[in-house]
Amino acid sequence: MSKVRVYEYAKEHQVSSKKVIEALKDLGIEVANHMSTINENALRQLDNAVDGTNKKAEAPKKETTSNENGNSKGPNKPNMTNSNEKSNKPNKPAGQANKPATANKSQGAKPATNKPANTGNQTQASGNQQAGGQKRNNNNNSNRPGGGNPNRPGGNNRPNRGGNFNNKGRNTKKKGKLNHSTVPPTPPKPKELPEKIVFSESLTVAELAKKLYREPSELIKKLFMLGVVATINQSLDKDAIELICDDYGVQVEEEIKVDVTDLDVYFENELNEAVDESKLVERPPVVTIMGHVDHGKTTLLDSLRNTKVTLGEAGGITQHIGAYQLEIHNKKITFLDTPGHAAFTAMRARGAQITDITILVVAADDGVMPQTIEAINHAKAAGMPIIVAVNKIDKPQANPDRVMQELTEYELVPEAWGGDTIFAPISAKFGEGLENLLDMILLVSEVEELKANPDRRAIGSVIEAELDKGRGPVATLLVQDGTLNIGDPIVVGNTFGRVRAMVNDLGRRVKKVGPSTPVEITGLNDVPQAGDRFVVFEDEKTARNIGETRASRALVAQRSATNRVSLDNLFEHMKAGEMKEVNVIIKADVQGSVEALAASLRKIDVEGVNVKIIHTAVGAINESDITLAAASNAIIIGFNVRPTTQAREAAENESVDIRLHRVIYKAIDEIEAAMKGMLDPEFQEKIIGQAQVRQTINVSKVGTIAGCYVTDGKITRDSGVRIIRDGIVVFEGEIATLKRFKDDAKEVAKGYECGITVQNFNDIKEDDVIEAYVMEEIERK
């Protein structure tokens, strides 16, 4: 015999290749797969094994078949003999011949219901014929479920026989189902109850059931028995949760969930978080320079940095907060230049909270002033050490001892007099005593043991923020802990974004900054508020969600604050008499000036008149500001910003009053005077025209000539002018020359070109706007 493959053998014997392989393995013959060959010896063994298996499988099958049918050839032979013997007897009912068959049927399924044989119509045939007929009937019915009747039933009995067949099959299945259902399934053993569950705020019945390893229906029943009606998705309060858990004997612990959208709480938790002492490193001290106006704060910082910041300020007064970092003896010190006059009280108080050391600058020739006292109170409230810098000791009328004597009244006693306050006499103008002052700062910082963890996500505060036309929202941040990197997802106050670029105080781009370092960043979606906290999160999605949530909450709070008058309290306002109220909209170039001006206006106390600031923002005055002012009958105050041409036209149409200022004292005095007398000023500024700079020409001994195109109104020779760049006033002065072609001109109307030079100003650039104005005297009403 030739070799046979496994799959061929399986196909020939109508079995699967898998079974053939298993049979060969049982015989100890290893084959790889269905393509393997079987030799003759293995084939004989496999045939014997397969034949034996088939015989064993056929034996019970035949036995079952014989039991079910009851008409197999073996058992029917005696019946055939009996029927042949009994068939010779006359008038014997044919139905009696079925008794043995009926007995056999009872072993299987339910017997078929046989009608009595019709003996009257039965033909009296010979015994041989009956025997032959009986044998024929048995042979025909041996394989039928309803067989066994020697008298073949007629056509009327066939449906009945079919019914018996179907009933037999169904009854067998039902019996099998009953046998299976009689064995009840073993219920799963419930899990043990936990010792304690932890929840925050509330839980639904389904959530509580999951924590207790119980079915919700069981909890609903228990709650109902305890007097609480609840559904599976209903939230349970703390009392209901404690009630059901007490019934089960389970302890309950409520987890206090920290609202990450509350940056102040989140900031304090992160700042006070316990860290490994080995990760802490020494950080530079953050120093705030405070004092009375014109006592030399900016000059002191200017001397330290060898810069000329003071020259760029209007009237010699610092209008913006700046942050700078110096390096002395291989150690860094971060300075915050906090403006000193009373208008910046809020900014100074906020600055005191983010700094470590306060330098109180007091002029030796002026002594203690109101802002000096205010700065002392802020520093003491923040619990910061104070170093007194007695400035202007180079002046002949300087009297440092008088300053020291006056400060003792405020618990600032010099070390020379037995106190613990460091006094450092300096001359910021000539640089005298500065090195000693810096040494004192480093000494105090060593005593304070200022440390931070740079190996964490950065947190800190906003020093300043503004809207830049080219870069968008720009914020100056002070990193208080951690390290800030480019690309970090950040939430700053009610704004969010990703840090796109960072510039340090020297104007250089950096990729990361550590603790106590000021840095200017871009990439926020809006301008934050000065003094806002900032936190770096792990992903941008979280930062976006928190920022949007905070912005929406702030908007809702702002709307609710501006709509405090309702039907409930309207009558009370009416009984109080006619309420005089001045609505004010403040627009400034930077956020710090906005807050300072707003804080100053709120302090104005005029009997019968209240100040209500309905809107503050950074940037030029636009049409939306005019629309808001017209709807709320408000006055617009612009600080270092100008209205756009469209906004000015809208203001004239809506009769909206716009007051523009560059020095904050003048704005405060004007508003206070208007509130006291409710009178218009004696002089009113009138804008007569605007011109756009198209080209600039530098001429020696003349300066910069601006080639302009008059876009609105007219430019006159005797008018005052302002140079506006990106909506911000960069210079204010007078026209030196106004020419049309090469001839001098008294005025140039709209639509014409002209050449303009401005007195004492040559930094004119293309796309600047030259605004011409005159002061008109008007009558008091």
Swiss-Prot record:
It holds the Pfam family EF-G_D2. Residues 82-93, 127-169 have a biased composition (Low complexity). Residues 44-195 are annotated as: Disordered. Residues 282-451 form the tr-type G domain. It is found in: Cytoplasm. Keywords: Cytoplasm, GTP-binding, Initiation factor, Nucleotide-binding, Protein biosynthesis. One of its GO terms (cellular component) is cytosol. Residues 66-81, 115-126 have a biased composition (Polar residues). Residues 291-298 are annotated as: G1. GTP binds at residues 291-298, 337-341, 391-394. SUPFAM superfamilies: Initiation factor IF2/eIF5b, domain 3, P-loop containing nucleoside triphosphate hydrolases, Translation proteins. Residues 53-65 have a biased composition (Basic and acidic residues). PROSITE patterns: G_TR_2, IF2. Residues 316-320 are annotated as: G2. The keyword Cytoplasm applies. It comes from the Bacteria. GO terms for molecular function: GTP binding; GTPase activity; translation initiation factor activity. Residues 427-429 are annotated as: G5. Belongs to the TRAFAC class translation factor GTPase superfamily. Classic translation factor GTPase family. IF-2 subfamily. One of the essential components for the initiation of protein synthesis. Protects formylmethionyl-tRNA from spontaneous hydrolysis and promotes its binding to the 30S ribosomal subunits. Also involved in the hydrolysis of GTP during the formation of the 70S ribosomal complex. This is Translation initiation factor IF-2.
